[in-house]
Amino acid sequence: GVFEPDAQTEMAMDYVARHAQEEAPFFLVLSIGTPHNPWTKDNVPAKYYEMYKDTPFPPAPNYSDEMDPYGDAWSNIEKNPEKLQEWMRIYYAMTNNLDWNVGRLRACIEENGIDEDTIFIFTSDHGEMFGAQGRMKKNSFYEESARVPFLLSWPGKVPALNLDLAMSNVDIMPTLLGLADVQVPEGVEGMDLSP
């Protein structure tokens, strides 16, 4: 079988190649679900799992095997260190695959000669707790869950910056509109964070 993120990326690359030569601008959203549970080695390509199969991952500095008293039952810590290690191996295997797929898509954009005309965003909706604060999964405002990467690239138009600031997914649409010199409609949640 084909790993879903690989297939999605292939479809996105095909879309880019088909639309790259058109006059009209296009918009593409690629929503890859990984890294995400189930944390089983049959849920990631073997070559990526093999990269991490013997890697020990230390617990987070704020790891606790005491359950968060305010956490939902489904987010309680798994009190099995070996299982937690295996889940982390699979998480990093999936992350490595995601990195490869994002790299393929960016290369496709460049190969089609539209990199300087393309605003590229990479982000995530949440992180993963893996025992930090005695929790698993997401749905908390702890840093491990709430702090996610946000990369925005537009060669020649947006200068390279490394910012440490709070923003939300609702800021993406107004920021894209701002970069495109399109007025943000009144009542839209979020802020235009374009430079």
Regions found by a protein language model. Give the residues of each.
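Short, intrinsically disordered, charge-balanced linker/junction segments flanking boundaries
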Residues: 186-195
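Active-site-proximal cap/lid insertion segments
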Residues: 1-9, 13-170, 178-187
